[in-house]
Each structure stands twice: as C-alpha cells, then as structure tokens.
C-alpha cells in the first residue's frame, strides 16, 4: 500500500497488470503475424534499448510528440537513470525512471513504455496501476507500437478482468 497525499491508496491491481503486460511484452518479443479472433495483423518486434543514453533519447522523443502532448498536456521533463542492486524498474513522481541495467528484461521498450505511462497518469489520488494508468499505457503503446499492439494490450487487460479508464 502506497502513501499518496497523506492517505493510503491500495494498488490492488498491480500483479494482474504485470501479468497482462508480461504476456503482451512476450508477443512484442516475437513480433510478426498474429491471428486475433479471426483478424490477421502484423505486430512490430520491440527493441532492446542497450544503454541509458538510448533510453533517454527515446523518452525525449516521446515527450516531444504532439500526439502524446495532446493526450497528456501536463507532461514534464523525465530523466532515465540506472538503478543498482534492485531487480525492478520504477517510476519516481519527481520525473525519474530508474532502470536496473544489469537485468536484460529491463532494457526492453515495453518496460520503458510502462514507466513512461506512469509519468503520463501519475496522480496522488489514484492507485499506481489503476484504470487511469492502464488508459495511459494503452495510449502510449498505441503511439510507440501502433494500434494493433494497443489492441492486444487492451485485450490482455480485459482478459485479466481489468478496466481501462476512458479518456477524459
């Protein structure tokens, strides 16, 4: 349970979100042709961003995107830094993404998208992996990977019984 704004907000969906996003990330690892309920489309293969400078350039590009700025008009600067001795990536509300560079999975685009979505949706009044976060994640996935990947992510959330907030 995280403290936000002086009160405890339970992040009850976190493990379900991680499971849904792990399935989605594995599909992006493979990329290629996907048959999805009778429709066939091609998924991109996610990149492995090998170092902090590549991750920072990627995040800077996303921050400068008019498409993401129009969806998330209050985006501030964001710094990507390394994280040692930890096995998880995380977002810090003061505009920092911390990546454990010694963990190969942490350098995948989907991990950076996840942490960037926290930056887009951060609120002291909502759970970190709640519906507003999931909405941001789908929007960022659509921008980075395309509509097909965003559709698969939304379906993974739906399969896990997770609501995605509507745009406000």
Place the predicted regions along the sequence by residue.
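Active-site-proximal or metal-binding-adjacent scaffold patches in catalytic folds
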Residues: 1-110, 119-168
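Walker B catalytic acidic pair
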Residues: 115
């Amino acid at each position: 349970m995280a403290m936000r704004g002086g009160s405890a907000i339970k992040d009850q969906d976190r493990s379900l979100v991680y499971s849904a996003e792990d399935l989605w990330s594995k599909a992006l690892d493979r990329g290629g042709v996907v048959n999805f309920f009778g429709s066939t489309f091609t998924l991109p293969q996610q990149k492995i961003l090998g170092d902090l400078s590549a991750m920072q350039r990627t995040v800077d590009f996303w921050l400068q995107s008019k498409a993401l700025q129009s969806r998330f008009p209050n985006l501030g600067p964001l710094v990507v830094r390394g994280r040692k001795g930890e096995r998880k990536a995380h977002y810090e509300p003061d505009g920092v993404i911390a990546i454990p560079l010694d963990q190969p999975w942490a350098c995948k685009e989907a991990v950076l998208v996840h942490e960037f979505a926290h930056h887009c949706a951060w609120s002291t009044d909502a759970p970190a992996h709640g519906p507003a976060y999931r909405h941001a994640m789908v929007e960022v996935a659509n921008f980075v990977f395309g509509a097909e990947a965003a559709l698969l992510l939304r379906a993974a959330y739906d399969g896990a019984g997770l609501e995605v907030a509507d745009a406000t």
